[in-house]
């Protein structure tokens, strides 16, 4: 298992990843990412 990191670090990491060529720009609207109060992430694709 892996340990959960701080949500601030994860948010910074996600911000870095968003600029990369992982996803094409027209796919941007297909991904809905959110965090709940406990810091657990969900993605609706």
Curated annotation (Swiss-Prot):
Alphabetic keyword roster: DNA damage, DNA recombination, DNA repair, DNA replication, DNA-binding, Metal-binding, Zinc, Zinc-finger
The protein depicted here goes by the name Single-stranded DNA-binding protein
Q: Which domain of life is it from?
A: Viruses
Subunit and interaction comment: Homodimer in the absence of DNA, monomer when binding DNA.
What is a biological process (GO) this protein takes part in?
DNA replication
Q: Which organism is it from?
A: Enterobacteria phage RB3 (Bacteriophage RB3)
* Protein function: Binds preferentially to single-stranded DNA and therefore, destabilizes double-stranded DNA. It is involved in DNA replication, repair and recombination. Binds ss-DNA as the replication fork advances and stimulates the replisome processivity and accuracy.
Further facts: Interacts with the polymerase and the uvsX and uvsY proteins.
